[in-house]
Amino acid sequence: MKTLAILVLCSLAAICLTSSASAGAQPAGDSPVQGGLFMEKDQASAVVRQTRAAKELTLAQTESLREVCETNMACDEMADAQGIVAAYQAFYGPIPF
């Protein structure tokens, strides 16, 4: 999914750069670098948020997920086959903690 998003953004950037280049000459003081191709690190971090790796679940948290999943027979069987985290997410959505 990330690859598709990056590909689309690169395609749009290429289209914008080629269309502005073919539209006419730029003034001498307006180089592409000053035109916004690059940005400061703090501005870039506001646009692209870094995701952190998920932390390990504690034994109490895992047991809590197991108790919720035990009430649903299909979820309980999936937990035995694929793991409690995959089963909980499939039936109840994202893990709440």
Swiss-Prot record:
InterPro entries: GLA-like_dom_SF, GLA_domain, Osteocalcin, Osteocalcin/MGP. Keywords: Biomineralization, Calcium, Disulfide bond, Gamma-carboxyglutamic acid, Hormone, Metal-binding, Secreted, Signal. GO terms for cellular component: collagen-containing extracellular matrix; extracellular region. It is found in: Secreted. Residues 53-93 form the Gla domain. The keyword Ligase does not apply. The modification 4-carboxyglutamate is found at residues 63, 67, 70, 77. The carboxylated form is one of the main organic components of the bone matrix, which constitutes 1-2% of the total bone protein. The carboxylated form binds strongly to apatite and calcium. Disulfide bonds join 69-75. SMART domains: GLA (SM00069). Belongs to the osteocalcin/matrix Gla protein family. In the branchial arches, BGP is found outside the chondrocyte-containing zone. It is found in some cells in the basal zone of the branchial filaments, near the branchial arches, and within the extracellular matrix in the medial zone. In the vertebra, BGP is found in the mineralized bone matrix. The gene is bglap. Ca(2+) 2 binds at residues 67, 70. One of its GO terms (biological process) is cellular response to insulin stimulus. One of its GO terms (molecular function) is structural constituent of bone. Residues 1-18 form the signal peptide. Ca(2+) 3 binds at residues 70, 76. Residues 19-52 form a propeptide. This is Osteocalcin. PROSITE patterns: GLA_1 (PS00011), GLA_2 (PS50998). Gamma-carboxyglutamate residues are formed by vitamin K dependent carboxylation by GGCX. These residues are essential for the binding of calcium. Ca(2+) 1 binds at residue 63.
